[in-house]
Curated annotation (Swiss-Prot):
Example GO BP: signal transduction
Family matches, as SMART domains: RAB, RAS, RHO
Name recorded for this polypeptide: GTP-binding protein Di-Ras2
Catalytic activity: GTP + H2O = GDP + phosphate + H(+)
Residue interval(s) of motif Effector region: 36-44
Location(s) in or outside the cell: Cell membrane
Modified residues (Cysteine methyl ester): 196
Keywords noted in UniProt: Cell membrane, GTP-binding, Hydrolase, Lipoprotein, Membrane, Methylation, Nucleotide-binding, Phosphoprotein, Prenylation, Ubl conjugation
PROSITE patterns found in the cross-reference section: RAS
Post-translational modification Phosphoserine, affected residues: 35, 126
Post-translational modification: Ubiquitinated by the ECS(ASB11) complex via 'Lys-11'-linked ubiquitin chains, leading to its degradation by the proteasome.
């Protein structure tokens, strides 16, 4: 039997049209829509298992518009982890992530302890690429976050994206325990090298 149940809040940010909703819908529902429908804000839940506990991923798909700064701040303050999405076909969409990243730093403080993924979506449109993966990798190193390219359309690296985000959380949670006594749960996790599994 699972020991506990808790919510883990993930906020997805990015400019309009980069595929935030497509990534979330592909992960949660396994679907992809060709048409672009602007999002104000949607929340989805996905249950995952992590060792012997059940965790509910609460994924907030935020607006790509700059008209709702209060909603953006609220999503950051409530979030446990962040996915910053740009389109590899739009350099501007990568540039637009910088103020969002800065706001996460401002609200959350030490971002080294927070799982953040920089995601280059639409890698199926490689002939129209404006952002090289090496450039995004360099930015991710500067921001001290992880990097991955995805395609919601082809279902490429979508599940892996959320899996990696959870792995970052586990690694960072474990690393925070080194200066004090580790709990039995932490010892068990390290002994088993257990991982959160996306169902």
């Amino acid at each position: 039997m699972p020991e506990q149940s808790n919510d883990y809040r993930v906020a997805v940010f990015g400019a309009g049209g980069v595929g935030k909703s497509s990534l979330v819908l592909r992960f949660v529902k396994g679907t992809f829509r060709e048409s672009y429908i602007p999002t104000v804000e949607d929340t989805y839940r996905q249950v995952i298992s992590c060792d012997k506990s059940i965790c509910t991923l609460q994924i907030t798909d935020t607006t790509g518009s700059h008209q709702f700064p209060a909603m953006q701040r609220l999503s950051i303050s409530k979030g446990h982890a962040f996915i910053l999405v740009y389109s590899i076909t739009s350099r501007q969409s990568l540039e637009e992530l910088k103020p969002i990243y800065e706001q996460i730093c401002e609200i959350k403080g030490d971002v080294e302890s927070i799982p953040i993924m920089l995601v280059g979506n639409k890698c199926d449109e490689s002939p129209n690429r404006e952002v090289q993966s090496s450039e995004a990798e360099a930015l991710a190193r500067t921001w001290k976050c992880a990097f991955m390219e995805t395609s919601a359309k082809l279902n490429h690296n979508v599940k892996e994206l959320f899996q990696e985000l959870l792995n970052l959380e586990k690694r960072r949670t474990v690393s925070l325990q080194i200066d004090g006594k580790k709990s039995k749960q932490q010892k068990r996790k390290e002994k088993l090298k257990g991982k959160c599994v996306v169902m």
